[in-house]
Amino acid sequence: MARKVVRTKRRERKNIATGVAHIKSTFNNSMVTITDPKGNVISWSSAGALGFKGSRKSTPYAAQMAAETAAKAAMEHGLKEVECFVKGPGAGREAAIRALQAAGLEVNMIKDVTPIPHNGCRPPKRRRV
């Protein structure tokens, strides 16, 4: 019996010049997702996906590495300029934006889209250490 040849589908180059970088920086992790203007994901990365564990995930360096990785993957699809939407209170917000610029992407706009409740859910109880 002949062995079936399994071919993996190679990702095709998307040729997208402008995109949107969604940076979510929480107290525990940093995630960078780069999409086209419609919202379809081109590339993404996070501090945890790069192998940072525990409290190292929340550092600015981890956010910088995540942004760099996502930017390089997006630039393979022809991306040149991005608009940044930053969400969350984490330490890696500015570091991620700087890393996008250092990777060679032109940042056109930076917008803070952190959700702020108009007195919605009750916050978690205070930590006693």
Swiss-Prot record:
Which Gene3D superfamilies does this chain map to? Ribosomal protein S11
**MF GO annotations:** rRNA binding; structural constituent of ribosome
Transmembrane residues, as ranges?
A: none
State the UniProt keywords alphabetically.
Answer: Ribonucleoprotein, Ribosomal protein, RNA-binding, rRNA-binding
Gene Ontology cellular-component terms listed:
ribonucleoprotein complex; ribosome
What the entry lists under Pfam families is as follows:
Ribosomal_S11 (PF00411)
Listed InterPro entries: Ribosomal_uS11, Ribosomal_uS11_bac-type, Ribosomal_uS11_CS, Ribosomal_uS11_sf
Q: Which PROSITE patterns match?
A: RIBOSOMAL_S11
Q: Per the UniProt entry, what are the Gene Ontology biological process annotations, in alphabetical order?
A: translation
Q: Which NCBIfam families match?
A: PRK05309.1, uS11_bact
Indicate the quaternary assembly.
Answer: Part of the 30S ribosomal subunit. Interacts with proteins S7 and S18. Binds to IF-3.
In UniProt terms, what function does this protein have?
Answer: Located on the platform of the 30S subunit, it bridges several disparate RNA helices of the 16S rRNA. Forms part of the Shine-Dalgarno cleft in the 70S ribosome.
| Protein family membership | Belongs to the universal ribosomal protein uS11 family.
Instruction: Name the PANTHER family on file.
Output: 40S RIBOSOMAL PROTEIN S14/30S RIBOSOMAL PROTEIN S11
Q: What is this protein called?
A: Small ribosomal subunit protein uS11
Origin species: Desulfitobacterium hafniense (strain Y51)
Native organism taxonomy: Bacteria, Bacillati, Bacillota, Clostridia, Eubacteriales
The encoding gene is rpsK
